[in-house]
Amino acid sequence: MTTTSAFMLNVRLDNVAVVAIDVPGEKVNTLKAEFAAQVRAILKQIRENKALQGVVFISAKADNFIAGADINMIGHCQNAQEAETLARQGQQLMAEIQALPVPVIAAIHGACLGGGLEMALACHRRICTDDVKTVLGLPEVQLGLLPGSGGTQRLPRLVGVSTALDMILTGKQLRARQALRAGLVDDVVPQTILLEAAVELAKKERLAQRTLPVRERILAGPLGRALLFRLVRKKTAQKTQGNYPATERIIDVIETGLAQGSSSGYDAEARAFGELAMTPQSQALRAIFFASTEVKKDPGSDAPPGPLNSVGILGGGLMGGGIAWVTACKGGLPVRIKDINTQGINHALKYSWDLLETKVRRRHIKASERDKQLALISGSTDYRGFSHRDLVIEAVFEDLPLKQQMVAEVEQNCAAHTIFASNTSSLPIGDIAANAARPEQVIGLHFFSPVEKMPLVEVIPHASTSAQTIATTVKLAKKQGKTPIVVSDKAGFYVNRILAPYINEAIRMLTEGERVEHIDAALVKFGFPVGPIQLLDEVGIDTGTKIIPVLEAAYGERFSAPANVVASILNDDRKGRKNGRGFYLYGEKGRKSKKQVDPAIYKLIGVQGQSRLSAQQVADRCVMLMLNEAARCFDEKVIRSARDGDIGAVFGIGFPPFLGGPFRYMDALGPGEMVATLQRLAALYGPRYAPCEQLVRMAERREHFWTNGETDQGN
């Protein structure tokens, strides 16, 4: 056997070369620049061995093929030319793999993403396992980049241009059966026979060429291609609002390769990669990637976590059902639900059943796996089955005496070490723990709705919460697939506190006569996934406005909302999407219909509904209040770092990722510009815009939230 660090070459007795990929000291295989020489040495041996019948590339890791290229390589590039050179080196290496004179097979188990899939595309055939861990995709667009090692050219020719555009523009990942249907892989097999199946495929002298479906062949022609690219450009522009330059470059590069040939396509790909790597959007998106990776590694405290073998949940409603699903089906932990009636328990069980059944229907999991996961969830109307639970999450109504009662009942019916975690969105954790016998085991664990989709949770210790309780709760959040940030026990915590003034200002502009759709469109153009008015409809107007009095009582007038407007809307039985009428009107459930602004809303709040402000003015009024409040949270140590503040805003409320989060955005603007803009807005609209002391100090000292040592790399 010849060993070259991350790549090991073994020639079998049947003259098939097996190249095992195993990056030393890492759980996950990633491609690094220094591996190029190692791979070339192996390729040289393969070319020189005339007896070889074929080659198989396979991972020696337990659950991943290659998860992508090491993103730090891009951060080390000083300019676009260096990044372009990096891409050309990758292209050349993949070309050498493709040019091998014998069949080359990629045997894929686990994640095959980014540079990993580009390497698999350079192989002559691909075969993968039917395991749930096996996913294939090109997610570079999520980092503001495009695939730089030939992916934009090989994928369209393999699966067709429309499928390739969809995969590369969205970064979506295909499961094994989806990849087979798309033509991305040639076979799907059990993991136990992956190597042997790949070897047998490698020994075939002539590999049949795959024919693209008729639709893809039509779209590959000049007329079909022109129509497709025109439609894709229009749809992409609507979706990105021009905020993500990578999407436009992806379309250009793929079109160039199809219209002018592969050579021109590879050249365009490398140049685009180099230029995109230097854009502020890519730098911000990479910063978010590194920050989220760091947060996922952060234990929350220095203490070791306590036992975490089973979980209890109080309340089987919308939040309780969602929490049960992520705990059992993502975390693999047994869950016991308690509700005051069987309907609540049945609701929670049906919640998980519906989500799992959707996965079965889409062939993401088998029915047996659905049943296995559902068996982890049980329920009762009393505390039977709770005595051994390590952590209990309450998801009951926002009522302080009720939550205090829950604490007392858990302490009476559960083990001495059981942690009580409250899913409150507004009540102080210290107040919930006020009468507790073991206050050190009481903590906040704030999920966002819908629980199965929203990636963030806030972990909220109060003054007496122990370090071990924090560590155990953070560990649970990670098992649930969440990104946890630890925040202080102050009114609104972090996410709701910075969101409230943003939504309040949108409502205030409505009272001034601005139109609903104009306000929402302005913030979507700025980069939010939905506008503030639509967000309020989605959350529920009753739910979303409930926290405003709490924040106003804690922080004063800057959190006041036009109370008469909110009252008028709620008194008219407008709750948003959940009851079909809010600021927007919604069609009947189960019937597809486009939401429309209800014109009656203007009469209800006593205005004409005629927009006078520009989109930029609307965005400034909402966003600047959010940024100012985020700076206050930093100053008051509500968040532990700018990193946590950026992650909380991006993952919790959809703050534009291409801006890197509120703190990176404020650093990009500069504290002096922030203070000047806030002062200008304060002169126009009142003292709620007065810049906070933190920003004024930073402007005087020319400081930034992110220190110079905190770059967009993982350090």
From Swiss-Prot:
Pathway: Lipid metabolism; fatty acid beta-oxidation. It is found in: Cytoplasm. One of its GO terms (molecular function) is NAD+ binding. The record marks 118, 140 as: Important for catalytic activity. Keywords: Cytoplasm, Fatty acid metabolism, Isomerase, Lipid degradation, Lipid metabolism, Lyase, Multifunctional enzyme, NAD, Oxidoreductase. Residues 1-190 are annotated as: Enoyl-CoA hydratase. It catalyses: a (3S)-3-hydroxyacyl-CoA = a (2E)-enoyl-CoA + H2O; a 4-saturated-(3S)-3-hydroxyacyl-CoA = a (3E)-enoyl-CoA + H2O; a (3S)-3-hydroxyacyl-CoA + NAD(+) = a 3-oxoacyl-CoA + NADH + H(+); (3S)-3-hydroxybutanoyl-CoA = (3R)-3-hydroxybutanoyl-CoA. GO terms for biological process: fatty acid beta-oxidation. InterPro entries: 3-OHacyl-CoA_DH_CS, 3-OHacyl-CoA_DH_NAD-bd, 3HC_DH_C, 6-PGluconate_DH-like_C_sf, ClpP/crotonase-like_dom_sf, Enoyl-CoA_hydra/iso, FA_oxidation_alpha_subunit, FadJ. It comes from the Bacteria. The keyword Lipid metabolism applies. Residues 306-715 are annotated as: 3-hydroxyacyl-CoA dehydrogenase. Its EC number is 4.2.1.17, 5.1.2.3, 1.1.1.35. The keyword Isomerase applies. GO terms for cellular component: cytoplasm. Heterotetramer of two alpha chains (FadJ) and two beta chains (FadI). NCBIfam families: FadJ, PRK11154.1. Catalyzes the formation of a hydroxyacyl-CoA by addition of water on enoyl-CoA. Also exhibits 3-hydroxyacyl-CoA epimerase and 3-hydroxyacyl-CoA dehydrogenase activities. PANTHER family: TRIFUNCTIONAL ENZYME SUBUNIT ALPHA (PTHR43612), TRIFUNCTIONAL ENZYME SUBUNIT ALPHA, MITOCHONDRIAL (PTHR43612:SF3). HAMAP family: FadJ (MF_01617). In the N-terminal section; belongs to the enoyl-CoA hydratase/isomerase family. In the central section; belongs to the 3-hydroxyacyl-CoA dehydrogenase family. This is Fatty acid oxidation complex subunit alpha. It comes from Salmonella schwarzengrund (strain CVM19633). The gene is fadJ.
